[in-house]
């Protein structure tokens, strides 16, 4: 038993005027007053800690709830019919047919990754994997969305190697393939990097698990790693506040991960599920035991009593508040019927997983009681802990938004040599250069079910070895577009993720998101947030695919400067047969090349605008989601395509370069019908476009015409190792080797040819 002297409920009643450090825990004056009103007294230290954790921005969504409701308001019955678990659960779960379900979610670990890059990123992977485990699923793959400051910024040089090393170390040790992602460099992320991790898992429909505590007398069992002092205050210290300059040393609030412990925990959980001994389950992530137990209690049909004296600890004399707020990793909390406790403990012992019975479900409805050292340190309604306050914060369009949307001048090369130089400059830019320097550290093919990963439009995985049924997943975002017009920016992210999935031949079925924004106390940021939510919700409704869940990360700023608003959007698609999926590597034999979709003179927020020094201004490309649907109708179930590659940042020039580099193929292309300006044809970033390779051009042209998809023949591939480009009145050539050298050298040169302990440079 701990020798720590607790502040008990009895003490709180006797000392009502005791000063408490509620502000240091992130609570406002009115929130503290509300807690006292709920309890009818001052809170104990443990109660104050639990309320501060659960009412933090990270856990309560108190500034975003009023806007997130719009996702539910725009979800039709038809859209919701395939969602087995949606918004509010640990992860969205989608019924994909044949008794199979897929769960996926993306979550942020931004602030911890700035403070301690390796552990912050590693535990971000571990946390999202446990979210998937808590749904009753086996995790099968991860992805990541990373944002850093400018490539030459000293802070980027400090943070990126640790983040990449953390992701690769944890994911590789778990034996989970990393099947895709994005890495973006922009000044706005200096001092506040974004580390968003996505995980996907599979399960049988009947094996779905949910987070609730029901059944009076059922036991609450904590299992996994022991509880220590790491990560205390993570969600309130790091997840709910912005950084000031020089605040990178908030180390006590950063969790420490052990991937080998999590790997064992995965197998232990799966055996527990198979044995049928779990009534409800919750992972321990942000908010630790305080969050897990209070959420289980709030979602159940009774109350809960927890005895902290039974919690396995790895530090001596921990207070009740410390035990509850600890964010030690690799822990789960389960509700188990009394008759199944023995079997539960046996399975944990088999896997050498530490476990302990720490409480039980009671018949005291909406009562959450916690005991430590034999004394009651918490006695509160769990519903008030779980629900938290809801703020409808001021929303105001920024005063400079109109000025920002004015189209500025950009350099427009006309001379052949200038256009060629611009092309090489673009592919070599930090925005578009090869990410192999990073991704080669990730194991993409472990488990043997990865069909597409490296340089693919979307990650493709087989989930059923007998039927070859599979899924395609893509996650995308553009902070530059969203800064210019948040509603359109969010829809462009949705459109790109949707198009990436479609270009593999998969049928999109669901959406997830991670919304990364600045301070919610800034009315301009809240306008960006509201507009982005509405854009994403309206876009998902138009496409007919539901938002199955998501995450919000506020306070992403350094001082008063917020990051670019960055709504990361993930789309999940289903493939009936992964062997028929469409890749993005040109076949060895020559094929005709076609461009699907129209090209307009759209450079607002483009990479060319950034690389040419024109800043950020204008309007982003027009998004037409009906055009995206027409592309889906053309691709899903089709066998017309030998390869495909969507167009996004960098436009057609970037797509042609990547196709040629990956296959070491040359090509002859005539762009005179794409746009009168060769420069615009190559570098504009119009949406709803895909380049395809096919030897069945006439069939493609006929089918595209039937669906209303604009189609332009570009030319054909060859073995010349040269791209020959023809415009309306100019022609030039560029060798594939020139493009490859420009594309591959940027990151290795910037980081001295090594990133982290696991670096393997291709």
Swiss-Prot record:
It is found in: Cytoplasm. The active site is at residues 58, 109. It catalyses: N(2)-formyl-N(1)-(5-phospho-beta-D-ribosyl)glycinamide + L-glutamine + ATP + H2O = 2-formamido-N(1)-(5-O-phospho-beta-D-ribosyl)acetamidine + L-glutamate + ADP + phosphate + H(+). GO terms for cellular component: cytoplasm. Its EC number is 6.3.5.3. Keywords: ATP-binding, Cytoplasm, Ligase, Magnesium, Metal-binding, Nucleotide-binding, Purine biosynthesis. ATP binds at residues 61, 105, 513, 550. It is an enzyme of class 6 (ligase). Substrate binds at residues 108-111, 130, 255, 327-329, 553. The keyword Ligase applies. Mg(2+) 2 binds at residues 131, 283. Pathway: Purine metabolism; IMP biosynthesis via de novo pathway; 5-amino-1-(5-phospho-D-ribosyl)imidazole from N(2)-formyl-N(1)-(5-phospho-D-ribosyl)glycinamide: step 1/2. One of its GO terms (biological process) is 'de novo' IMP biosynthetic process. The keyword Electron transport does not apply. NCBIfam families: FGAM_synth_II, PRK01213.1. Part of the phosphoribosylformylglycinamidine synthase complex involved in the purines biosynthetic pathway. Catalyzes the ATP-dependent conversion of formylglycinamide ribonucleotide (FGAR) and glutamine to yield formylglycinamidine ribonucleotide (FGAM) and glutamate. The FGAM synthase complex is composed of three subunits. PurQ produces an ammonia molecule by converting glutamine to glutamate. PurL transfers the ammonia molecule to FGAR to form FGAM in an ATP-dependent manner. This is Phosphoribosylformylglycinamidine synthase subunit PurL.
């Amino acid at each position: 038993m701990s020798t720590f002297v607790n502040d008990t409920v009895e003490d709180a009643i006797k000392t009502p005027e005791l000063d408490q450090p509620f502000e240091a825990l992130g609570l406002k004056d009115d929130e503290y007053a509300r807690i006292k009103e709920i309890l009818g007294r001052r809170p104990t230290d443990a109660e104050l800690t639990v309320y501060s954790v659960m009412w933090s921005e990270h856990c309560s969504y108190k500034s975003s709830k009023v806007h997130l409701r719009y996702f539910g308001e725009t979800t039709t019955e038809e859209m919701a019919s395939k969602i087995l678990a949606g918004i509010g659960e640990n992860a969205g779960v989608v019924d994909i047919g044949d008794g199979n379900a897929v769960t996926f979610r993306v979550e942020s670990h931004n602030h911890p990754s700035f403070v301690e890059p390796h552990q912050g990123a590693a535990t971000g992977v571990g946390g999202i994997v446990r979210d998937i485990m808590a749904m009753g699923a086996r995790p099968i793959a991860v992805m990541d969305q990373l944002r850093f400051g400018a490539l030459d910024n000293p802070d980027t040089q400090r943070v990126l190697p640790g983040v990449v090393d953390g992701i690769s170390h944890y994911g590789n040790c778990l034996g989970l393939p990393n099947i895709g992602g994005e890495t973006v460099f922009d000044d706005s992320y200096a001092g506040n990097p974004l580390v968003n991790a996505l995980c996907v898992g599979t399960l049988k429909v009947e094996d779905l698990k949910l987070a609730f505590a029901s059944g009076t007398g059922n036991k609450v069992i904590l299992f996994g790693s022991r509880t220590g002092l790491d990560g205390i205050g993570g969600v309130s210290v790091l997840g709910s506040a912005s950084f000031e300059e020089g605040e990178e040393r908030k180390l006590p609030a950063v969790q420490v991960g052990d991937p080998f412990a999590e790997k064992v925990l995965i197998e232990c959980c799966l055996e527990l599920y198979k044995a049928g001994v779990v009534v409800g389950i919750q992972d321990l992530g942000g908010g630790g035991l305080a969050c897990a137990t209070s959420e289980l209690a709030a979602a159940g049909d009774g109350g809960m009593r927890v005895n902290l004296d039974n919690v396995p600890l790895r530090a001596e004399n921990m207070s009740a508040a410390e035990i509850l707020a600890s964010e030690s990793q690799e822990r789960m909390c389960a509700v188990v019927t009394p008759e199944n406790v023995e079997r539960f403990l046996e399975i944990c012992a088999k896997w050498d997983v530490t476990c302990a019975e720490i409480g039980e479900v009671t018949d005291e409805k909406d009562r959450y009681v916690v005991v430590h050292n034999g004394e009651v340190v918490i006695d509160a309604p769990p519903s008030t802990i779980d629900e938290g306050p809801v703020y409808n914060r001021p929303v105001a369009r920024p005063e400079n938004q109109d000025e920002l949307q004015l189209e500025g001048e950009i350099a427009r090369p006309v001379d052949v040599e200038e256009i060629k130089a611009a092309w090489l400059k673009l592919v070599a830019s930090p925005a578009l250069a090869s990410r192999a320097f990073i991704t080669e550290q990730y194991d993409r093919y472990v488990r043997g079910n990865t069909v597409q990963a490296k340089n693919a439009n979307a990650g493709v995985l087989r989930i059923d070895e007998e039927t070859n049924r599979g899924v395609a997943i893509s996650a995308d975002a553009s902070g530059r577009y969203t800064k210019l017009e948040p509603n359109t920016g969010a829809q462009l992210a949705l459109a790109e993720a949707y198009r990436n999935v479609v270009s593999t031949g998969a049928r999109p079925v669901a959406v997830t998101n991670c919304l990364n924004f600045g301070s919610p106390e800034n009315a301009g940021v809240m306008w960006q947030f509201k507009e982005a939510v509405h854009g994403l919700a309206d876009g998902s409704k138009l496409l007919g695919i539901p938002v199955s869940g998501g995450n919000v990360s506020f306070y992403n700023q350094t001082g008063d400067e917020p990051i670019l608003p960055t709504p990361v959007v993930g789309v999940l698609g289903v493939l009936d047969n992964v062997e028929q999926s469409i890749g993005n590597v040109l076949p060895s034999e020559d094929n005709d090349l076609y461009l699907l979709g129209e090209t307009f003179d759209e450079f607002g927020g483009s990479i060319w605008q950034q690389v040419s020094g024109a800043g950020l201004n204008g309007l982003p490309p027009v998004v037409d989601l009906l055009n995206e649907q027409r592309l889906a109708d053309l691709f899903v179930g089709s066998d017309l395509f030998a390869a495909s590659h969507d167009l996004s940042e960098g436009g057609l020039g970037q797509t042609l370069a990547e196709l040629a580099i990956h296959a070491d193929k040359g090509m002859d292309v005539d762009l005179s019908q794409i746009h009168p300006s060769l420069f615009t044809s190559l570098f504009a970033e119009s949406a709803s476009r895909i380049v395809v390779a096919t030897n069945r051009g006439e069939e493609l042209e006929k089918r595209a015409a039937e669906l209303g998809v604009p189609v332009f023949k570009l030319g054909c591939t060859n073995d010349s190792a040269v791209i020959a480009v023809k415009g309306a009145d100019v022609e030039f050539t560029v060798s594939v080797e020139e493009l490859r050298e420009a594309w591959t050298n940027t990151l290795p040169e910037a980081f001295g040819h090594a990133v982290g302990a696991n670096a393997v440079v291709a």
